[in-house]
Amino acid sequence: MGNKTALYDIHQSMGGKIVDFGGWDMPLHYGSQIDEHHKVRQHAGMFDVSHMTVVDVTGSDAKAYLQYLLANDVAKLDNLVGKALYSGMLNEQGGVIDDLIVYNMGDWYRVVVNCSTREKDLAWMSQVANNYQVKLQERADLAMIAVQGPQAIAITKTLVSAEAATLIDNLQVFQGLASTQQGSDWFFGRTGYTGEDGLEIMLPNEQAGTFWQALAAAGVAPCGLGARDTLRLEAGMNLYGHEMDENISPLAANMGWTIAWQPEARNFIGRAALTAEKSAGQRHKLVGLVLRERGVLRAEQLVHIANSDERGVITSGTFSPSLGYSIALARVPVTQVPLTPGAQCQVEMRGKLVTVDVVAPGFVRQGKALV
């Protein structure tokens, strides 16, 4: 038996197929993963993401601590209360311990990390914190519900207080703010993991069930981990343990944009290793692959590139419900003739080489095909 979120009993009552995910008992789907996927692209769906780890960082050194801990620079959030930042948290070798989101909460910060990496993340964050005047508080008292899709925000606004509805109206993309709701502090973030507009809502565990059921009654479809994965892959978003891990640098995982090289005086964990990698010339990169014929691209399949003895590897692959054919992300070697969008390569499938098209890492956003 794994850990359970505050919504576990409701998932069961709604017919959710429960599976283990990073030590948590979570719904894979509620009957049809494909239908749930389309609901998010076309209307609105909701996901229980309470298994994510929320850590509040307070103290006089909170900013300096995060500036050293993360490859991206929280100074970008100065004077932007609620603004969020996506970053890798690296080891000294430049590998990705985890990817995360950090919110500027005024004089403190809220960090959201993955569930499968919770123990090592908290241990690493605590170890680094020993050299700073900071306090780390895990918020296990909060549930998190992601409401995603073109109608997600409009529906959510009808179910919250007037104050919260106004706050949601004024939220910018990648911004999150607290609001008093039902006598408690709720947090509304205009963020997500689907490629659609929507909200990620943090609220007290004891209020999560009632709100989930209100969303369902308003026409928001309960969705499981299966649809969450196909949606994020269509959007070209990384999944920890697939596109990156402790042995993969952000430069090889299409995360170079999350590294704040300036100011040069700012030191951060992994900077020396990334600088050396950059100077030596990047050896691997992440690309998108498309197979418009029959067949499904899957993780761990090898990628053959013309005039290269080194093989690439598919990191994530699936059938795309929105496009009607297979898509994948793949880590490939940087060759003399670069593998760029418009090129082709071959993938090993059942002992045969199948030709696929190379595209930028991203296939569907805001309901529209990018390929």
Swiss-Prot record:
Point out the coiled-coil segments of this chain. Answer: none
Instruction: Offer an example of a GO molecular function term for this protein.
Output: transaminase activity
What is the catalytic activity of this protein? N(6)-[(R)-S(8)-aminomethyldihydrolipoyl]-L-lysyl-[protein] + (6S)-5,6,7,8-tetrahydrofolate = N(6)-[(R)-dihydrolipoyl]-L-lysyl-[protein] + (6R)-5,10-methylene-5,6,7,8-tetrahydrofolate + NH4(+)
Pfam families xrefs? GCV_T, GCV_T_C
Which biological process annotations from GO are given for this protein?
glycine decarboxylation via glycine cleavage system
What EC class does the entry list? Answer: transferase
The reply to whether Magnesium figures as a keyword in the UniProt entry is no
Enzyme Commission number(s): 2.1.2.10
One GO cellular component term: cytosol
InterPro entries in UniProt: GCS_T, GCS_T_bac, GCST_C, GCV_T_N, GcvT/YgfZ/DmdA, GcvT/YgfZ_C, TrmE/GcvT_dom1
Keywords assigned by UniProt, alphabetized: Aminotransferase, Transferase
Instruction: Quote the subunit structure annotation.
Output: The glycine cleavage system is composed of four proteins: P, T, L and H.
Job of this protein: The glycine cleavage system catalyzes the degradation of glycine.
Give the similarity note.
Answer: Belongs to the GcvT family.
This chain belongs to the protein called: Aminomethyltransferase
What species is given as this protein's source? Cellvibrio japonicus (strain Ueda107) (Pseudomonas fluorescens subsp. cellulosa)
The taxonomy runs: Bacteria, Pseudomonadati, Pseudomonadota, Gammaproteobacteria, Cellvibrionales
